[in-house]
Amino acid sequence: MLKVTNAGFGYGNRPLLFSKVSFEVKAGETLAILGPNGIGKTTLLRCVMRFLALKEGEIEIDGAGAKHMNQKRFWRDISYVPQAKQLVFGYPVVDMVVMGLSQNISIGRTPRREDYDRAYALLEKFGLGSIANQSCNTLSGGQFQMVLIARALIKGPGLLI
């Protein structure tokens, strides 16, 4: 469960971009954050992901304060799908999906066959099996976004943002 209570954020000494934002999302629920450009939707999600620190309020994940959670546990339980295409250096699609397991693949341990089997199965489920070995640089924006969603889901997170 994700719970945001009276969240507020602003850059530096500037006025708060948003304040008093509260919501709760339970397991199995979906939440859409809507609003005009520049109102702070992405910034709020970046705060939830701990890329930015709130100026006020609290974020809890499964009842624990997010800012006090162990970093390894936090990243094990949560996956994030960015909204913009990132530089990917021509990785094959399947490798991009396997990178979602990076917390499980430590230095000295390369991805295993079962990691790739999971990635191929997920790509098939998303209708992307035919492009699994294609370079990410050749994908449309929509295809690439689906690859990023598959990468986020491969580790079975409790929360997908």
Where are these regions (language model features)?
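Helix-to-loop junction immediately C-terminal to a conserved catalytic motif
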Residues: M49
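Conserved ABC ATPase "signature" region
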Residues: V98, R113-I131
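Conserved ABC ATPase signature
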Residues: T110, S135-L139, Q143
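Conserved structural motif at the start of ABC-family nucleotide-binding domains
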Residues: L2, L16-K20
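Conserved catalytic motifs of ABC-family nucleotide-binding domains
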Residues: G156
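Conserved ABC transporter NBD signature motif
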Residues: G57-K67, F74
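The feature captures the beta-strand-to-loop junction immediately N-terminal to the Walker
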Residues: L34-P36
